[in-house]
Amino acid sequence: MVKVNENYLKLKAGYLFPEISKRVNNYTQANSSSKVIKLGIGDVTEPLPKACVKAMGEALNEMGTNNGFKGYGPEQGYGWLREKISVNDFISRGCQISSEEIFVSDGSKCDSSNILDILGSDNLIAVTDPVYPVYVDTNVMTGRTGETLQNGTYQGLVYLAINEENKFQPEIPKKKVDIVYLCFPNNPTGATITKQELKKWVDYAIENKSLILFDAAYEAFIQDKNIPHSIYEIEGAKNCAIEFRSFSKNAGFTGVRCAYTVIPKNLSGQNSKGDKIDLWSLWNRRQCTKFNGVSYIVQRGAEAVYSSQGKKEVNSLIDFYMKNAEIMQNKLRSAGFKVYGGDNAPYVWIKVPDRMTSWDFFDYLLEKADVVGTPGSGFGLAGEGYFRLSAFNSRMNVNNAMERIINI
């Protein structure tokens, strides 16, 4: 009989969001008249920018003509999109990232998982706690984490707690780690990092020859001009960091699928003999073997994000969701909750009432207010006692959900 990858058996009972869906489905089946408002999964709700819809429509029509038809595209992405990304997202901020260093993909979730294909399995990995579950689970699946401990953590990972005490800023590891996952603006806490703090991480990585995997999926929601949008705003980062970006949240592409990963050409690792190996070439080889590229139609839609109309419409979407976050902050604070995040990210991170666990509070909100959020413990041991609410919803739903919560 065929043997399975037993690393999958080390995973916790279920990925966080399917577990939430299961509980909500059980509740709605038992309470058919309930009108549940979901502020849990970070999926967008508002329509795509008109500029993107128009561009994709035109691209679709092109595909129906002999002259305009496109077959397989470049695995790295079309040059015209990569150039727009380079100029608008990096060079405009003083980051010297060339179009060749940008790889277009169908999602940063996929890329942050697939990047492990080019990294050795014996690297020591550090993650924040709480953390986006994908970082941990994909390392478990590939056998990099060791055994599961009784408290639900993994023997082979280094956990960097982020909490009220350290203002949700992970401390630099006391020992050398090979790979560090950083996500700012942070999912799930909504915290941000200053240039000064990020510089400490870059300095650590250079000194220890470590690699930073920097998830900037929520950078478009930054309101504070002093907060960095990219790790490449920090001197030296091109020698130690890979950055993941996405069109999912800023342009509403969760159902369209387009993202990109930046791998600087001078970024390198080493083989077992100690020889330098450049990571750009490995990732390019990986993509050419395992990926056929993002569709032409979708890439034209992504290109439209950088048009003058597209920029206005994307900014309007961001303003809409950030207003939702502001409403949530104000209402929850007026009800006596401790609230974090929501200033530069579309998530608010709240302290649950005393003597309640995160899952207790989940059930409490569901049963008393018909509101769904995400238990902090689902993001890691240090997330216990917290709860995430997402600003990705309609204004009416956000207002109604807040009224329900404060009137419990």
UniProtKB/Swiss-Prot annotation:
What EC class does the entry list? transferase
| Function statement | Involved in the synthesis of meso-diaminopimelate (m-DAP or DL-DAP), required for both lysine and peptidoglycan biosynthesis. Catalyzes the direct conversion of tetrahydrodipicolinate to LL-diaminopimelate.
Q: How does it assemble?
A: Homodimer.
Q: Which CDD domains match?
A: AAT_like
From the UniProt record, report the name of the gene that encodes this protein.
Answer: dapL
Report residues binding substrate.
Answer: 15, 42, 109, 132, 187, 292, 388
Specify the domain of life of the species encoding this protein.
Answer: Bacteria
Q: Say which family it is in.
A: Belongs to the class-I pyridoxal-phosphate-dependent aminotransferase family. LL-diaminopimelate aminotransferase subfamily.
Residues annotated with N6-(pyridoxal phosphate)lysine modification: 249
Q: Which residues bind pyridoxal 5'-phosphate?
A: 72, 108-109, 132, 187, 218, 246-248, 257, 292
Q: Which NCBIfam families match?
A: DAPAT_plant
The enzyme's E.C. designation: 2.6.1.83
Kindly give the InterPro entries that the UniProt entry links to this protein.
Aminotransferase_I/II_large (IPR004839), DapL/ALD1 (IPR019942), PyrdxlP-dep_Trfase (IPR015424), PyrdxlP-dep_Trfase_major (IPR015421), PyrdxlP-dep_Trfase_small (IPR015422)
Alphabetically, which GO biological process terms does the record hold? Answer: lysine biosynthetic process via diaminopimelate, diaminopimelate-aminotransferase pathway
Q: Please spell out the taxonomic lineage of the organism that makes this protein.
A: Bacteria, Bacillati, Cyanobacteriota, Cyanophyceae, Synechococcales
Protein's name according to its UniProt entry: LL-diaminopimelate aminotransferase
Cofactor(s) of this protein: pyridoxal 5'-phosphate
Which GO terms of the molecular function aspect are on file?
A: L,L-diaminopimelate aminotransferase activity; pyridoxal phosphate binding
Query: What keywords does the record list, in alphabetical order?
Result: Aminotransferase, Pyridoxal phosphate, Transferase
* Catalytic function, reaction form: (2S,6S)-2,6-diaminopimelate + 2-oxoglutarate = (S)-2,3,4,5-tetrahydrodipicolinate + L-glutamate + H2O + H(+)
Pathway given for this chain reads: Amino-acid biosynthesis; L-lysine biosynthesis via DAP pathway; LL-2,6-diaminopimelate from (S)-tetrahydrodipicolinate (aminotransferase route): step 1/1
